Structure formats: C-alpha cells, structure tokens
C-alpha cells in the first residue's frame, strides 16, 4: 500500500505532462508549418481570406519569383502563406509568410538580409523589426514576413497582433544563434551582423560565414568569422585566400605559427585586409586603413574563440 501511494501520483504527473505536450502544437512532434498561421483570424475584424497555401523548393518561385534563389542556400524546406483581410475594409489585407529553414542560424541568415541597423526593433521571437508597411522576425528555425496589401502603410499594433499570434504557434527556440557570440566585441556595430550561407565576400573558398560592421578609434571596417569543422579545413581555407592574394593582391606579409597564421595585404576588392587562421576558425577584417586597430580587433576575436573553446 505504501508503495502504490507514491507510484500513482508519479504516473499521474507524467500522464498530465504528456497530454499537455501533445495538446500544444508547439511542443508536439512533427509541427506542421500550416498550423503556424492563424486558421480564422488574429484580431477583431481581421479574418483569413482563403485557406493557408503551402510551397516547397519546387514551387516557391510561384510565390516569390524574384527572391526564391536567395532562400535555397539557407536550407529552405517549406513555406506557408495566408492573407488576412479587414472586414470593415476588404481592400486592406496583411500577407503573412512563414518560411522553415534548416536551422536557427539559417533563419537568422535570411532575416539578416533584410534588416538594417536603423530599423525600429520589436520584441518578437529572437529578434524582429517593423516599419509602416511590413514586419519581420525570426524564431527557432522559422523566418516570418508580414506585409500590408491594398495600402502603403498599416498601424504598428496590427502588425504586432498578427506577429504575436504566429510567434505563439512556433517553437520557442533558444534565442539568437550561438555562432554570433564570437563577433560580440566592443567595436561591433549592433545589429549589423549578417550570415552568408555561401561565398562570403564573394569568394568561393570562403564557403560561408558571418560578417559585421565594426568601429573603433575613429576607424571603420568589417570583421568576419568563418567556422570550419576542423583546424585542417580552416588552414586550407586560409591557404586558398593567401594564394589568391599572392596572385592578385599587394603588400603581403605573413606571420604566425601552424595553429595561428596571419596575413596582412591589400585585397583588390576590399582594400586593406588582415586575416587569421585561429584553430578551426578563419577570422579577419577588411576595408582596413589602420592595421594596428585591425590587429586589436582580431586579437579580441581570437580571445573570444579561445574562451569559447575553453583554452
């Protein structure tokens, strides 16, 4: 009897947890992207016009013909879209698009292609911004884009009501991608980070990476980080860039050791550059005018890599 009195509450607690998880689409396995969009409406007088439409890699061009190619390198998987009309003004509507990408980093990557450092930020998802005509945010591996139709502007509160409803139907996620942490040095210009899923700086040997604006001691430049799987892969990437600079660049200086190689040069496209291979990473600064300031920023990036690796 004593044993059963303890066992039953435990089983009851576990059963209730399972029921709660399955009843919430956010936590249920196999969340359908179709269920992310409100099925009827999101606020008073705002109702869905037609059923939710779904698109995949083969049909995305039908919805965003001029932009579809931008999404594919970020692991685009599926997209759901719906229009919500105002019952008092049927010509006014919001088009809501939800894109499912490969990862939170990829969702950030798409989002970062649209944001600007002077946007009006809103507390939606991991990060979001709103203007008079649109609202965008990303959350977990989803990118959400809301746009007004039938008018040139819409009240911010209407955008926010729609965005919050969609956000509540998405997995909560863990905030911003951890890959951004390395760039968080004092010189970083806030909200300037961009993740490029292919050909960072336009160079095929820089397969993918994160780039951002930096400002220190009255100097402006761009800093970047490329995360390779191994130190050998990072060295190969570094060597490919070094070979390119030897063929096309000027004023090349090479220093360091096998674990931390550094090159200073003039890139034909980006002017002064300082690039370093640091373990599994390639880090660098471009558009450099003051090499000593660039070295300081690279040292700070290297310090964050070392701290992250527990070295």
Report residues per predicted region.
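Short non-domain terminal segments
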Residues: 9-13, 127
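N-terminal secretory signal peptides that target proteins for export/translocation
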Residues: 1-8
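Bacterial N-terminal signal peptides
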Residues: 12-23
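Soluble, non-membrane globular domain cores that form compact, hydrophobic packing
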Residues: 23-311
């Amino acid at each position: 009897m004593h044993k059963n009195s303890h066992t039953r509450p435990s089983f009851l607690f576990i059963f209730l947890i399972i029921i709660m998880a399955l009843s919430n689409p956010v936590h249920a396995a196999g969340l359908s992207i179709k269920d992310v969009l409100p099925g009827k409406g999101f606020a008073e007088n705002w109702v869905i016009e037609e059923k939710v439409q779904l698109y995949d890699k083969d049909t995305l061009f039908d919805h965003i013909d001029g932009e579809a190619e931008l999404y594919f390198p970020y692991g685009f998987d599926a997209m759901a879209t719906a229009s919500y009309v105002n019952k008092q003004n049927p010509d006014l509507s919001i088009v809501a698009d939800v894109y499912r990408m490969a990862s939170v980093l990829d969702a950030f990557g798409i989002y970062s292609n649209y944001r600007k450092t002077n946007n009006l930020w809103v507390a939606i998802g991991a990060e979001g911004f709103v203007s008079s005509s649109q609202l965008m945010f990303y959350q977990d591996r989803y990118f959400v884009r809301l746009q007004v139709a039938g008018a040139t502007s819409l009240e911010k509160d209407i955008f926010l009501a729609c965005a919050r409803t969609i956000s509540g139907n998405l997995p909560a996620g863990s905030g911003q991608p951890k890959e951004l942490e390395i760039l968080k040095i004092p010189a970083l210009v806030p909200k300037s980070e961009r993740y490029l899923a292919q050909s960072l700086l336009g160079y095929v040997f820089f397969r993918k990476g994160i780039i951002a604006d930096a400002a220190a001691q009255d100097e402006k430049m761009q800093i970047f980080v490329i995360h390779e799987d191994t130190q050998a892969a990072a060295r190969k990437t570094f060597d490919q860039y070094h070979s390119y600079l030897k063929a096309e660049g000027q004023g090349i200086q090479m220093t360091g050791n096998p674990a931390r190689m550094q090159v200073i040069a003039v890139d034909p496209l980006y002017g002064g550059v300082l690039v370093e291979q640091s373990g599994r990473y390639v880090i660098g600064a471009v558009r450099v005018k003051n090499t000593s300031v660039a070295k300081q920023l690279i040292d700070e990036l290297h310090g964050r890599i070392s701290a992250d690796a527990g070295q």
